[in-house]
UniProtKB/Swiss-Prot annotation:
One example of a Gene Ontology biological process annotation: RNA processing
Lineage: Archaea, Thermoproteota, Thermoprotei, Thermoproteales, Thermoproteaceae
Active site: 312
Subcellular location: Cytoplasm
Gene3D superfamilies: RNA 3'-terminal phosphate cyclase domain, RNA 3'-terminal phosphate cyclase, insert domain
EC number from the UniProt entry: 6.5.1.4
Record-given protein name: RNA 3'-terminal phosphate cyclase
Keywords assigned: ATP-binding, Cytoplasm, Ligase, Nucleotide-binding
One GO term describing the cellular component: cytoplasm
Protein source organism: Pyrobaculum islandicum (strain DSM 4184 / JCM 9189 / GEO3)
Length: 348
């Protein structure tokens, strides 16, 4: 039975494609997506989307139609789920994090452990930075029982990319439900401020501004300063994350840009993290839209909270409901949004 998805639904971006391909590949259900990225100024598939599609096709021996730059229709029919070692080259500064987002749910149910070596952009606009994936995404997924490790070899920024990341995924039988509406007691705030092919003071100023901004709000943060000179081009950024006594992790990040003061970058990341901490939720807005896939696949009722009901989140819930017999509940309680679903306890 083919699943038909209208790519112009909700936020109408690449997220619809990523979630649809991930669930199609995992469940072995063919999917046809039309009006892909219909609401974007450059509609249709772009190189980084094609990498995610072709990587999912490689892992599942899929038949695909419409996998070309600018295509607004894609047909994807998966066959056998493989595992092992795979090299994926995005070929541009396309986001490595977004490729991981597509492939992680598939590989958790693969027949054996998998190692992915991915080349592309590690810290680019409109995507979670790689340190967010390493320290927030991986830790939140571990609450569901997922075992994923992400190793950063080299950073890659826009426009040249060239970053390299190694991802290890251990297969599991079933994901377990997660029931955390409260963040818990704050244990520590950590961070990494990086600068590549730039003076050390850029990373130092980002870190200092982040720590000072958080200190004014009563938070203490330990931020590691990382400088490298092995990039294909210059770039900088900062990722902060807060951990609680019950294992919840939320993050805030910002990317350096030409002409943007380093202090502003650090302050922006700190303010984003503080805004989430203030609400006492268990998921930051970025993680909430990624978590719904795992909540639906897990065994039992999952209940989590986030600080914003973004269009990304609502769109992702809708896409998951097209593939799985689940119904999400999204309810506003004070400053929080409670996400609840009875997961199907998927197993291969």
């Amino acid at each position: 039975m083919i699943v038909k998805i209208d790519g112009s639904y909700g936020e109408g971006g690449g997220q619809i494609l990523r979630t649809s391909i991930a669930l199609s590949a995992l469940l072995g259900k063919p999917v046809e997506i039309i009006n892909i990225r219909a609401k974007r100024t450059n509609p249709g598939l772009q190189p980084q989307h094609l990498t995610g599609v072709s990587a999912a096709a490689l892992l599942t021996d899929a038949d695909i139609e419409g996998a070309a730059k600018g295509s607004t229709r894609l047909y994807f029919k998966p066959k056998t789920l493989k595992c092992g070692t795979f090299n994926i080259d995005i070929g541009t500064a396309g986001s490595i994090s977004l490729v991981i987002q597509t492939l992680a749910p598939i590989l958790l149910y693969a027949p054996c452990p998998t190692k992915l070596v991915i080349t592309g952009g590690t810290d680019v606009a409109w995507a979670p930075p790689i340190d967010y994936m390493r320290y927030v995404f991986v830790k939140v997924l571990s609450l569901f029982g997922a075992k994923i490790a992400i190793e950063l070899v080299r950073r890659g920024h826009y426009p040249r990319g060239g970053g390299r990341v190694i991802v290890y995924v251990e297969p599991i039988k079933k994901l377990r439900a997660v029931h955390y509406v409260e963040f818990g007691r704050l244990v520590k705030i950590s961070g990494i401020s990086h600068a590549v092919n730039l003076p050390t003071h850029v990373a130092e100023r980002q870190a200092k501004a982040a720590k000072e901004t958080l200190a004014k709000l009563g938070y203490v943060a330990e931020v590691e300063v990382e400088t490298r000179s092995d990039g294909l081009g210059p770039g900088s950024g900062i990722v902060l994350w807060a951990e609680s006594d019950i294992g919840n992790v939320v993050g805030g990040d910002a990317l350096g840009e030409r002409g943007k003061p380093a202090e502003e970058v650090g302050r922006e990341a700190a303010e984003r993290l503080a805004a989430v901490l203030k609400t006492g939720v268990s998921l930051d807005p970025h993680m909430a839209d990624m978590a719904v896939v795992y909540m639906a696949l897990a065994e039992g009722r999952s209940k989590m909270s986030t600080s914003e009901a973004t269009l990304h989140l609502q769109t992702n819930m809708y896409i998951v409901e097209q593939f799985l017999p689940v119904k999400f509940k999204l309810e506003k309680t004070g400053a929080r949004y409670i996400i609840e679903v009875d997961g199907i306890g998927y197993s291969r």
